[in-house]
Amino acid sequence: MKYLLFLLCFLPLQALCQDVKVIINEDFGLIYKSDTLYASLVANGDTIFISDDDVSWHLQDLLRFQNQTLKEEGIYIRYPDIIAMEIEQIATLLDYKSEVNYKNAIKNERRTITFYGPITLMLRKSHTVTIKKCTLVIENNKLIKYHCSYCQHDDVGIPTENTKFEYKYDEKDRIVKIFNKGKLEQTISYVEQQ
């Protein structure tokens, strides 16, 4: 048994489902600039801050460094903008589905929505990540943070120029359908927790 556990320690990290905590703000700007928080990010390797600049770090960096103590200068892992935008669109479909909900929202009301995959999102032209579950936290009708668990990161993806994603929300069946150029690519189920 001990020998088996020893071998498991050396399995490729990509083979395991890892949790990724993501904190965003409405304009996808950098939220925290504190050296202390960045140091925490480096030490824990489990929180990614979305940036609106052109730094293109990939989830592979998170997998590579999550169990290591990095040097003080650290590596700032940035979540690619494309995933932020994809999840933002899904959140919009789930939460802003009617004007009534928007107009009648209670000030500072916080709601949590969880959707289930697997859903494959595109990082760049040739990188994808497969998410198994994503929980959105919405406060006062704004997506304030989400927490995703992903199972796979691939170097083979769909080129950007060949994609045109459309999202269709089905309130009755509690699913979101994702189409690419009119063809159904994926179906996401979700639950809503009031």
Give the location of each predicted region.
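Buried hydrophobic residues that stabilize the cores of well-folded domains
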Residues: Q18-Q194
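Bacterial Sec-dependent N-terminal signal peptides
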Residues: M1-V20
